[in-house]
């Protein structure tokens, strides 16, 4: 898929097809996003920047990726385990990498069932356009709403593109002073301050920021006791 009108139209048509047939997106259905690893390619600094960005804001992305639900799907931890705690513990090793190829060995977290799956990345030929050479975001819930898919795709691609020209001083500060253990409440609650930090870093226009924040906030609905996906009140037109 490319950022062209015809592809977005096809996406909308697929979602409408699923909606008409009442496709079940509540029970363990994931909406994984694959983005070509060639977006970062052989740019070592871009890879380092992206990992830092993802590590710092995984808890913000998690609520956003719940999509039109305000909770995660039931078996999320089984098939998309939060990866920020693992990445955080390997930051120093990652920073010492001198080539993109060496990243594969500096980060021994190559498990497909993590929220960020790097198993498909060809670290030996990161510029190749092979459709299998992808970075996979596994946290998103499935949805039959095309706007949710558009928002998710836009966020993932903007994160990767931004990483090629990102000043990481602020992220380094966050990494030095934050707590990156997994906590269900942290990954589900509304945190406006850090959500605003994220959108100001990642997006270069107000419309993208509004779409992200609207999907992230979801009428401020929160419930930390529910262990399954629950539809949020309508916030997407």
For each predicted feature, which ranges?
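C-terminal accessory/tail domains of diverse enzymes
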Residues: 1-24, 38-237
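Short, conserved phosphate-binding/catalytic loop or strand-edge motifs used
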Residues: 29-31, 35
